[in-house]
UniProtKB/Swiss-Prot annotation:
Pathway terms, separated by semicolons: One-carbon metabolism; tetrahydrofolate interconversion
UniProt-recorded name of the protein: Bifunctional protein FolD
Enzyme Commission code(s) on record: 1.5.1.5, 3.5.4.9
Native organism: Natranaerobius thermophilus (strain ATCC BAA-1301 / DSM 18059 / JW/NM-WN-LF)
KW Transcription (keyword) present: no
GO biological process: L-histidine biosynthetic process; methionine biosynthetic process; purine nucleotide biosynthetic process; tetrahydrofolate interconversion
Keywords noted in UniProt: Amino-acid biosynthesis, Histidine biosynthesis, Hydrolase, Methionine biosynthesis, Multifunctional enzyme, NADP, One-carbon metabolism, Oxidoreductase, Purine biosynthesis
GO terms of molecular function: methenyltetrahydrofolate cyclohydrolase activity; methylenetetrahydrofolate dehydrogenase (NADP+) activity
Length: 284
């Protein structure tokens, strides 16, 4: 068998078409959604991500501003910038591109962002709201994964979902979203014993560890849905955390890399920015 592809690029395009209409509606009421992105340093991958966010925002009519700071910027200066953006009523969403230089306290920076403008949903209050099912914003990559599952009408009720990776950005929040849909969730990590036994029991396997091709076809249950979150550059080629060629012969559905989860992450960031702008309009 050969797995059917879940093409995030196609799903994202459809969603952005709807987002464009939402932006037009907000503009007709005098509000232009505005995303401010803070980029610290010269990391090439971060610059690429920021450029993609800026370009995609423009396509749906969202205003975007990029604040670029040098690698050696003082933490206090970065905090002052965030405070300015928090107080700027024309800015609806604030995103600090990660990772940050080692001398800057990442938690302190993310905690400084106004929780109502925290479109990445990394603020401790928003993380807490997610755990009790009262989310203001859904973290972008997990939200994108759920949309991909919806695009194939995948019923999570009673399914065994295995999440490989326990990061605050993907692993933990996606597990909570899956629980909300009545999946039985197992989280695996570097200390998990009998990893293959766990992955082979998964009806849904989500891999987000940042290690090239760590999951092979032999580790996948026949017919399973496989969501590959990883993006790794190897020999100038982008590959996922799943060995695609062997996995596609076993899985029922699989996301490609690139063109799978990545486009969805940016699209859901824009969705959160629009939601933040809509909240501001409702409070006027």
């Amino acid at each position: 068998m050969s797995a059917s592809l879940i093409k995030g690029s196609d799903v994202a395009k459809e969603i952005r078409s709807d987002l464009q209409k939402d932006v037009e509606d907000l503009k007709s009421q005098g509000v232009t959604p505005h995303l401010a992105v803070v980029l610290v340093g010269e990391d090439s991958a971060s610059q690429t991500y920021v450029n993609m966010k800026e370009k995609t925002a423009g396509k749906v009519g969202i205003e975007s501003t990029v604040k670029r700071l040098p690698t050696n910027v003082e933490e206090d200066e970065l905090l002052r910038l965030i405070d300015e953006l928090n107080k700027d009523d024309s800015v609806h969403g604030i995103l600090v591109q990660l990772p940050l230089p080692y001398h800057i306290d990442e938690y302190k920076i993310l905690n400084a962002i106004d929780q109502y403008k925290d479109v990445d949903s990394f603020h401790p209050v928003n993380v807490g709201n997610l755990t009790i099912g009262q989310k203001r914003f859904t973290p972008c990559t997990p939200a994108g994964i759920m949309k991909l599952l919806d695009s194939i009408d995948y019923d999570l009720n009673g399914k065994h979902a295995v999440v490989l990776g326990r990061s605050n950005i993907v692993g933990k929040p996606i597990s909570l979203l899956l629980l909300e849909r009545n999946a039985t969730v197992s989280i695996c990590h570097s200390r998990t014993k009998d990893l293959t036994e766990m992955t082979k029991s998964a009806d849904l396997l989500i891999v987000a560890v940042g290690r090239p091709e760590i999951v092979t076809g032999k580790m996948i249950k026949p017919g399973a849905v496989v969501i590959d979150v990883g993006v790794n550059k190897v020999d100038d080629k982008l590959i996922g955390d799943v060995e695609f060629e062997s996995a596609k012969e076993v899985a029922g559905w699989i996301t490609p890399v690139p063109g799978g989860v990545g486009p969805m992450t940016i699209t859901m960031l824009l969705n959160n920015t629009i939601e933040a702008a809509r909240r501001c309009l409702n409070e006027q």
